[in-house]
Amino acid sequence: MAEAKTHWLGAALSLIPLIFLISGAEAASFQRNQLLQKEPDLRLENVQKFPSPEMIRALEYIEKLRQQAHKEESSPDYNPYQGVSIPLQQKENGDESHLPERDSLSEEDWMRIILEALRQVENEPQSVPKENKPHALNSEKNFPIDMSDDYETQQWPERKLKHMQFPPMYEENSRDNPFKRTNEIVEEQYTPQSLATLESVFQELGKLTGPNNQKRERMDEEQKLYTDDEDDIYKANNIAYEDVVGGEDWNPVEEKIESQTQEEVRDSKENTEKNEQINDEVKRSGQLGIQEEDLRKESKDQLSDDVSKVITYLKRLVNAAGSGRLQNGQNGERATRLFEKPLDSQSIYQLIEISRNLQIPPEDLIEMLKTGEKPNGSVEPERELDLPVDLDDISEADLDHPDLFQNKMLSKSGYPKTVGRAGTEALPDGLSVEDILNLLGMESAANQKTSYFPNPYNQEKVLPRLPYGPGRSRSNQLPKAAWMPYVENRQMAYENLNDKDQELGEYLARMLVKYPEIINSNQVKRVPGQGSPEDDLQEEEQIEQAIKEHLNQGSSQETDKLAPVSKRFPVGPPKNDDTPNRQYLDEDLLTKVLEYLNQEKAEKGREHIAKRAMENM
């Protein structure tokens, strides 16, 4: 029993390394197979290292010739599968049973096998394989089927044949000296005579491959001829197209489309540039037209100024003739002669223009000039005037009252009216100038003399007006350039002052409408009594703050000027007032003030429209 157990144990121990060896071999072969599949370049490089079968046949043929020349020498053993490592390893390891059969072959058998192989190759013409074409070692085309027994090849299973297809990893297997190359081995084995025969064999092989090369050359020549014919046809078409079109190239459709698109883009760019030039010219012409319109307007303004001068001159003549306040009899006789002598064409033309501007019939205008009377009969004597002989002698300082002239010329009836009644006639009933001044906290019109100039600084700058005398020469008059800026500045300052007063009055009226509690408090305090100074101060501060907020929106410069005016606004009863029963402004008075302001605005609008109409005429 013990011997049997030891026998089984030894067998098991011997099987274990055998199993490991088998599994390692299979794993190595599998890994090598996968490596060659993943990297076919490596496989091609290894396959290219084998000699081609034609070279092997040539070497066998040379060996046969050498045997015929030297029969005493033994033929060397050339294995056609010299580069394959797997069969040779198996021959060395375990296939010793086939060696006696191989050794039993004689030289005659070898020669017979080689001759049959060469005859078969000559009978079956094959295309010359490429130099770098990999050769399958077990292919049936290279070797006949009946030669398998002669070459003593072992019948491998299919699994092992797959491994046989792949080349060995190293060429040095089965060589006597692995450090020598193939050409060195051949040089050692062959003599100069064998090399000469080898050259003859290669010449014969070149003759066999000659027809194929000739076929290739013929194909190349035919292809060249075909391409030459195509070039000739293309040139002929080009020549014909150039004759028809007129020298243009026969371009393809894409090139034509590209050229058309480029031309269209160029045309569009040229059109845009032309349009821009036209627009620039139009703008320039428009600017010139605007300048011409400005010149026309200036000429119209000058004409209207001249007309206004003529009208003022005639009106002064009428007033002077009507009043009868001429200085001496010579002036009276001169005025009567002026109206008695016949009118020339220029004066008639001037009268027609005056009647057209004033919208008065010419007959009425002539009657007015002759009689010097007004239709309403309210002729007031003006200040004494010296009648100038020429229109150019009128000083423009006398024409600095455009509002006076407008009020005279543009009344409701179409005839002149005085300046003093212009403001009082427009006031509604029950509302006087004193009420408005009390509302604004100013003095009455009787106690306050309105100064024409806003400040004494401008009054000092005004040049004195020189009286006109008939004997005074033109050299004594001041030039226009010296005193015109002062007159214009004075007029602008006066207009700005009037505008500011009007804006202040309108704003105070709006404040009274917005804060009706001020009026109610005034009505309650009509009974004479002494109000608390703290309440008065609070109300005054509220009103002053509201006025400052309003003025900050417009301009910060007017805030300091208008703050004392707001302080003078009567909120409560005055502290030191001699008239305790002072009348306060009520709602009716406020509505009257608003009506008056609206009426003034409407009159100003009508005057502006009439003035524009006169200028356009």
From Swiss-Prot:
It comes from the Eukaryota. Its main location: secreted. The keyword Signal applies. The keyword Calcium applies. One of its GO terms (biological process) is angiogenesis. It is found in: Secreted. Residues 1-27 form the signal peptide. One of its GO terms (molecular function) is chemoattractant activity. The modification Sulfotyrosine is found at residue 151. Residues 28-30 form a propeptide. GO terms for cellular component: extracellular space; secretory granule. Keywords: Calcium, Cleavage on pair of basic residues, Phosphoprotein, Secreted, Signal, Sulfation. The modification Phosphoserine is found at residues 174, 268, 432, 532, 555-556. Residues 123-147, 552-583 are annotated as: Disordered. Pfam families: Granin (PF01271). InterPro entries: Chromogranin_CS, Granin, ScgII. Belongs to the chromogranin/secretogranin protein family. Binds calcium with a low-affinity. Neuroendocrine protein of the granin family that regulates the biogenesis of secretory granules. Interacts with Secretogranin III/SCG3. PANTHER family: SECRETOGRANIN II, SECRETOGRANIN-2. This is Secretogranin-2. The lineage of its organism: Eukaryota, Metazoa, Chordata, Craniata, Vertebrata. The gene is SCG2.
